[in-house]
């Protein structure tokens, strides 16, 4: 089709729209209500799109204008509702907003501005296939259309602009034919826009409605080649005014949307951070709870072990029985019954007789047979008691039987109680009929006291044996029954511990010991008669009361064994005596003993022994120390005071306050010092009296008799006629002949039956052979010798347990073997180390502790004599580590065959009866081995040094130089080198030779340290084979160094040389490593 076709197309389109253009006011009125022209415009555009294939490029131009008009009208709806290409459309919209904000301002300033076409707005994307390409085209159209209005401002008319646009068809992109679905979609979108505009018109003013209708008509007129410039300008102005608010609202919505998304993103990030923090806190809290749970579990385990060690651990069955007994006791107390065992330990009360006779008189046989209850004389309580106690009759059958057996023997005493009770009951009933229950209970207590007093005066035939039967099962402590306190003597070697005991018991044990040094634990029991006789000198006025049955004193060889006994958890020692030599003051083992006593919180007194060593001291045998001191000369008293103050100062340095016992006003804060002399016995009565006073007054709770058994094995000995026996310390409880006992053995737990219980004669040492006293049962505290089967392999120092009726032997066996397992845990698992053999567990632990401090591994341990099998086991070290092929044997016999085998195999056996001698012998052997190692490694071990040449006396074969030691130590046989830097930066090492001899001040020396030689040292070097001329290859200005290597550094780390290398020398080695390039 040619121009004619094109014109006819335009004519038809203008005819269709002519009425609207001519009657614009009428159209605006109609569009305020409805806009049917949009539907007609859509139909026209569809027909035009079908016929556009046959038109020229100019006609395509007209179709494009029409399409742009439709797209412009639907811009906002597509931005909000169409999900395709949000990012590209957003960018285009922002560009459009800037243009629309700019163009209306120009329209207001120019009175006759050119018509701005709707094509100035960017084209919307018509299909999702090419969003990027369409965006680019849109941006290109924007640039072109932004340029054309500027030309219109220079005087050109709107119609000429339209014609110029029509005359440039190549610049307009070709528009494709829309499908039916696309047309329907556009139609729907226009319908949505129309409804949206209607809603906006209802809210706006009449002027805004007019502007909105003008916009619609202007959009239609823009696509039509209008001829009236004034109408076109009016439409353009209306369109510009309408577009501004809509685009601003859209931009505002987009900003709100963007702000909302950013806020949501921030909230999500904050929630994620909070969640992560909560998770971390939860993990921390969980870890804390887990740690607390583990600590609690460990605490419960330790508490359980401690209770087991003390014999206080109860099985489930025992706990149930105890709870049942407690409930029954509570029921009795609530019913008004009073238990004798809980009456503050009033031993004088005899409630068993009162209850029995009163209940017989009132017809209540159940109370009379119970033997442990005391009821009120009040009638109301007597009536209630049968109902309460009838429930317990079946549980008290045994006690009833025992009491009935004694009724005949107690008839006379019962009659006395009957008369006394009848006399007291009549006024009681008459006076207290209206008294409250509290008054009755008070009267019951007062009656019981009166009854006890009368019973003591009138009835002296009462049997004391009934008292233990009256004690309830719940109470295992009798407050009026104190056992013998256990006292331990500690102190440094040769301070006079055993000699002090010899003075107490009038014995001479110390002289019979090997080297005069105690090697084993010994126990001596002092009966109260002996104590009274000993303290008679200081108790002339009779102020000191004796409430304990005796005193058990344990003599220890040192802190090691005492630690071993304390580690078992037994309360073996109640009070301790720390012996200090007044001439020497505090010594190393004394300080160790103080630390041990402080850790165990054991109270102690200090015996300042050997006061008779003071020059000029006049001894008075077995005298009180205050009396003896007052009879000495003034000079001796001054020296005594000086030495005491010096020891007090040393104790203060250890954190202890101390004072002489007769000047001590605060026993709780100050340690008492008792001057003594083991030779003359002076001060010994003061010491014993102080021990008795402290234990009775300040420690009565700790020495109460407890039925729970606590027993520790001290020694294992073979006695002629008795066989293998064990010496034990019975701290608490009772041992009976025939008891089933469990103790620790080298081959496993030992379960046997007691055949005999023996004790030494009073004031006799348990270690000394003497006649023994046989016992059917022994009460704590006492040193006891037990005869039983299978005791040969018993471990000295371990606990002893008695199998009760409700105990399981296997459980006790596992518990008792824990002591040995803890000891075996110290053995080196690598299998390389020395073999240790000892007589007791305590001495074995002392040896192991010493070897641990010396950092010497232990491969095997054993208790008892040394046999061939022990030597064979030790001989395996000859292949692994020859220096550890030795045995340390303390206080044990070595079999003759074992000695011969050890000599053949090359195993060294160290045996000693004094543990300190064994330490010395082993230390000397170690030094000898180290010296051999040093000699063997002397060529390899090179000590670091830096030398400065002072003078050259001989420059070749041999080189003799005068040098000064700048750093380190110069020794004989040290290789000396000079180091020069090559042009490439690498060090060049020039060997001069080894040091053959050293002279300082014309005297030969083996080594010279830094700063030791003021005028220098003459050093002779033996040539290493290379012909070096001092002065040619090496000059006096060159520094000289000892030639160290990686092998020499490793040899210095060996124990043979490690102690000889100082910290400064190690720093010098680090510097020389960099110089010689050693890695």
Curated annotation (Swiss-Prot):
Record-annotated membrane-spanning stretches: none
Catalytic class of the enzyme: hydrolase
This protein's name: Eukaryotic translation initiation factor 5B
CC cofactor note: Binds 1 monovalent cation per monomer in the active site. Structural cofactor that stabilizes the GTP-bound 'on' state. May also act as a transition state stabilizer of the hydrolysis reaction.
Organism per entry: Schizosaccharomyces pombe (strain 972 / ATCC 24843)
Function: Plays a role in translation initiation. Translational GTPase that catalyzes the joining of the 40S and 60S subunits to form the 80S initiation complex with the initiator methionine-tRNA in the P-site base paired to the start codon. GTP binding and hydrolysis induces conformational changes in the enzyme that renders it active for productive interactions with the ribosome. The release of the enzyme after formation of the initiation complex is a prerequisite to form elongation-competent ribosomes.
Chain positions covered by the region annotation G3: 555-558
Places the protein is found: Cytoplasm
């Amino acid at each position: 089709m040619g121009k004619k076709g094109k014109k006819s197309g335009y004519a038809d389109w203008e005819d269709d729209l002519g009425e609207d253009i001519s009657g614009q006011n009428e159209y605006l009125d109609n569009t305020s209500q409805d806009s049917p022209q949009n539907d007609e415009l859509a139909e026209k555009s569809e027909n035009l799109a079908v016929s556009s294939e046959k038109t020229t490029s100019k006609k395509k131009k007209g179709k494009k204008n029409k399409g742009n008009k439709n797209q412009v009208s639907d811009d906002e709806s597509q931005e909000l509702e169409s999900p395709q290409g949000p990012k590209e459309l957003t960018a285009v919209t922002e560009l459009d907003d800037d243009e629309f904000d700019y163009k209306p301002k120009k329209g207001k300033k120019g009175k006759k501005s050119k018509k701005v076409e709707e094509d100035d707005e960017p084209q919307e994307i018509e299909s999702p296939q090419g969003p990027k390409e369409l965006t680019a085209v849109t941006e290109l159209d924007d640039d072109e259309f932004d340029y054309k209005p500027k030309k219109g401002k220079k005087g050109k008319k709107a119609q000429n602009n339209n014609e110029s646009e029509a005359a440039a068809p190549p610049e307009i992109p070709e528009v494709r034919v829309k499908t039916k679905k696309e047309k329907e979609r556009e139609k729907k979108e226009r319908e949505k826009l129309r409804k949206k505009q209607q809603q906006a018109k209802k809210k706006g003013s009449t002027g805004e409605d007019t502007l909105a209708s003008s916009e619609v008509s202007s959009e239609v007129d823009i696509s039509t080649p209008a001829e009236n410039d004034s109408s076109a300008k009016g439409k353009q102005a209306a369109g510009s005014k309408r577009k501004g608010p809509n685009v601003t609202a859209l931009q505002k919505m987009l900003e709100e949307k963007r702000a909302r998304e950013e806020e949501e993103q921030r909230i999500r990030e904050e929630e994620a951070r909070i969640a992560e923090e909560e998770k971390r806190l939860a993990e921390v809290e969980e870890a804390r709870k887990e740690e607390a749970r583990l600590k609690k579990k460990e605490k419960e385990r330790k508490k359980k072990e401690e209770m087991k060690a003390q014999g206080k651990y109860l099985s489930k069955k025992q706990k149930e029985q105890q709870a049942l007994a407690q409930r029954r006791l509570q029921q009795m107390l609530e019913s008004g019954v009073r238990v004798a065992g809980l009456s503050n330990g009033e031993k004088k009360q005899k409630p068993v007789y009162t209850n029995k006779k009163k209940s017989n008189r009132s017809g209540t046989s159940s109370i009379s047979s119970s033997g442990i209850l005391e009821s009120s004389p009040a009638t109301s309580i007597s009536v209630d008691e049968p109902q309460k106690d009838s429930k317990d009759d079946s549980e008290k059958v045994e006690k009833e039987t025992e009491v009935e057996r004694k009724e005949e023997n107690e008839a006379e005493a019962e009659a006395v109680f009957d008369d006394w009770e009848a006399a007291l009951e009549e006024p009681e009933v008459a006076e207290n009929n209206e008294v409250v229950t509290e008054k009755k209970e008070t009267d019951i207590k007062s009656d019981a006291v009166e009854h006890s007093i009368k019973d003591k005066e009138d009835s002296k035939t009462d049997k004391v044996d009934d008292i233990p039967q009256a004690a309830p099962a719940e109470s295992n402590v009798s407050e009026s029954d104190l056992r013998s306190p256990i006292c331990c003597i500690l102190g440094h070697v040769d301070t006079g511990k055993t000699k002090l005991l010899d003075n107490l018991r009038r014995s001479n044990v110390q002289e019979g010991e090997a080297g005069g040094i105690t090697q084993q634990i010994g126990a001596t029991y002092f009966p109260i008669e002996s104590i009274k006789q000993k303290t008679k000198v200081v108790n002339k006025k009779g102020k000191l009361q004796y409430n304990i049955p005796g005193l058990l004193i344990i003599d220890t060889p040192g802190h090691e064994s005492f630690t071993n006994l304390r580690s078992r958890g037994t309360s073996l020692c109640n009070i301790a005596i720390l012996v200090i030599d007044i001439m020497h003051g505090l010594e190393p083992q004394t300080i160790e003993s103080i630390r041990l006593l402080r850790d165990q919180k054991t109270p102690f007194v200090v015996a300042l022994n050997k006061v008779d060593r003071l020059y000029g001291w006049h001894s008075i045998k077995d005298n009180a120390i205050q009396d003896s001191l007052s009879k000495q000369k003034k000079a001796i008293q001054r020296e005594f005071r000086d030495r005491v103050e010096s020891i007090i100062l040393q104790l203060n340095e250890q954190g202890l306050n101390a004072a002489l016992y007769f000047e001590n006003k605060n026993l709780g804060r100050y340690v008492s010092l008792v001057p003594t002399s083991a030779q003359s016995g002076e001060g010994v009565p003061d010491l014993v009296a102080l021990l008795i006073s402290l234990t009775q007054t300040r420690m009565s709770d700790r020495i109460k008799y407890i039925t729970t058994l606590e027993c520790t094995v001290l020694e294992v000995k073979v006695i002629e006629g008795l066989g293998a026996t064990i010496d034990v310390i019975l701290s608490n409880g009772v041992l009976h002949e025939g008891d089933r006992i469990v103790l620790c053995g080298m081959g496993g737990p030992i379960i046997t039956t007691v055949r005999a219980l023996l004790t030494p004669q009073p004031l006799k040492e348990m270690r000394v052979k003497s006649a023994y006293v046989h016992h059917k049962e022994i009460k704590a505290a006492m040193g006891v010798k037990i005869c039983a089967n299978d005791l040969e392999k018993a471990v000295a120092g371990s606990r002893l347990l008695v199998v009760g009726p409700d105990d399981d032997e296997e459980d006790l066996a596992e518990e008792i073997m824990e002591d040995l397992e803890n000891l075996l845990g110290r053995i080196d698992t690598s299998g390389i180390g020395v073999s240790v053999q000892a007589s007791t567990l305590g001495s074995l632990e002392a040896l192991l502790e010493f070897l641990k401090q010396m950092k010497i591994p232990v491969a095997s341990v054993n208790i008892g004599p040394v046999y061939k099998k022990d030597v064979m086991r030790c001989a395996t070290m000859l292949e692994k580590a020859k220096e550890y092929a030795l045995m340390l044997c303390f206080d044990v016999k070595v079999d003759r065959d074992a000695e011969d085998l050890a000599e053949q195999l090359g195993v060294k056996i160290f045996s000693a009866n004094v543990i300190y001698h064994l330490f010395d012998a082993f230390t000397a052997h170690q030094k000898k081995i180290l010296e051999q190692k040093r000699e063997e490694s002397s060529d390899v071990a090179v000590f670091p040094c830096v030398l400065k040449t002072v003078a050259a006396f001989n420059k070749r074969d041999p080189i003799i130089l005068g040098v000064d030691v700048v750093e380190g130590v110069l020794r004989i046989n040290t290789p000396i080198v000079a180091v020069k830097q090559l042009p490439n930066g690498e060090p060049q090492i020039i060997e001069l030779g080894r040091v053959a001899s050293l002279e300082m001040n014309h005297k030969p020396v083996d080594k010279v340290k830094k700063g030791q030689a003021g005028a220098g040292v003459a050093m002779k070097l033996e040539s290493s084979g290379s012909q070096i001329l001092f002065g040619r290859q090496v000059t006096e200005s060159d520094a000289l160094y000892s030639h160290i290597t990686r092998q020499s550094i490793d040899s210095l780390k060996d124990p043979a040389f490690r102690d000889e290398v100082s910290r400064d020398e190690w720093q010098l080695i680090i510097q020389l490593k960099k110089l010689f390039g050693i890695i």
